[in-house]
Amino acid sequence: EEWGEGPPVYLVHGWGGQRAHLAVFVKPLVEAGYRVVAFDLPSHNESDPGALAPGRTTATECADAIAAMIETHGPAHAVVAHSLGANSTVLAATQGAQVGRLVFLAPMGEFPLYLDLFAARHGFGRRIRSGLQQRLEKRIGMPLHETNMTWTGRRANYPPLLLIHDPDDPDSPHAASERVAAAWPGARLLTTRGLGRLAHYRILRHRNAIRAGLDFISHRAKDTNVAEQPNPSARFT
């Protein structure tokens, strides 16, 4: 889907999501003079099945889809991405996609760490966890650590980056975003507070997170220490 006129801003949802999950950004971006492009990643919602099977895809396949959308609709002024969509966006940039400014909400900055969490939740031991990694690496055609944003960012020439993340997020560790911010020249990390066990998804509706993303896209980034704090339990620090 597409709305508005002006420099394109792409909305990229996360794993198991759909384009509507970032719909809250559409109206303010259009009002700010941007053309907004949103789409479903392979095997998600209304998109065609991925190469693996219906309902299954990989970060690299999603990266190919993002690169194809940017090639079709024009170089991005910015990309707003959530969760796995953030990793795939940087992978697309390593392929030459012009991604512009990046706003990443609860990104999976280190996919091996996510695999550790998955294995722990399901009670998998070291052998099964190692087997899962080998299968994933075979599917994506590269070592899993090469999907880490600290690795792919360098290959993408470190586009301007704003990370927004909550320490309560159980699905994508905040610590990974801290490491990405430390390793990515010029990157900024805004930390929300108090979003609870559903932080990975609540951040998509967090008023200050949305405002910070819009300001960053429009080159109006504010100091995190003076961000408006209408709700002390959900503030930036």
Label for each model-derived stretch:
Residues 170-176:
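Conserved alpha/beta-hydrolase "acid-adjacent" motif
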